[in-house]
Amino acid sequence: QPVDMAAPNDGSGRLFIVEQTGKIRVWNGSSVLATPFLDVRTLISTGNERGLLSMALHPNFATNRTFFIYYTDTSGNLAVARYQASVANANVADAATATVLLTIPHPGQSNHNGAKLAFGPDGHLYFGTGDGGGGGDPSGNAQNLNVLLGKMLRIDVDHGSPYTVPPTNPCVGQSGKRGEIWAYGLRNPWRFSFDRGSG
């Protein structure tokens, strides 16, 4: 089941198609290549709203070959990982470059995982997380600023290891609040976008 798509800014005309079951396929302009760009089926949990859920290409993908994926891991946790495309074959990712940037516990429910990854006009990586599932957010995650569920998060993936928190994030430096938070009180931000005019 296709759930997301990304177009590289490298002049190739390709499209990357994200399948919830764990593969990313390459459309080369005329057909879908037989060999997946990436296969993470052994790393993810599937069923209900779980799986491989989103992909974002680094703004400099054409030169650094870097991209990011969002998925539910084998324990049902939310995970964001960084990869690079192979130097030898641009249509295949190099699995050896995988680095998990962030894992967010998501206990008890298989729904409300959020899912979208996208780079903003500021060059930072944004992603939405679901509230953890269950009717009415029974754990109160979305309003709890000490957990990352039910939020819009913003991180700087170009500095630090594995990332840094932008100093302009609203909760930075506040006790009991996670600095990655950009917005909170969200139920299940499955998809979002940036205004092309105002950002």
Where are these regions (language model features)?
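A fold-level detector for beta-propeller and closely related beta-sheet-rich head/sensor domains
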Residues: Q20, D122-G123, G130-D131, L148-L149, ...
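Beta-propeller blade signature
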Residues: V80-A88, G140-D158
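Short, well-ordered junction/capping motifs at the entry into regular secondary structure
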Residues: P107-Q109, T168-I181
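Flexible glycine/proline-enriched surface loops and loop-helix/loop-strand junctions
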Residues: G132-P138, G173-K177, N188
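Acidic/polar, solvent-exposed loop segments in beta-strand-rich repeat domains
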Residues: G135-V147, Y163-P167
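Repeat-solenoid scaffold signature
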Residues: K177-G199
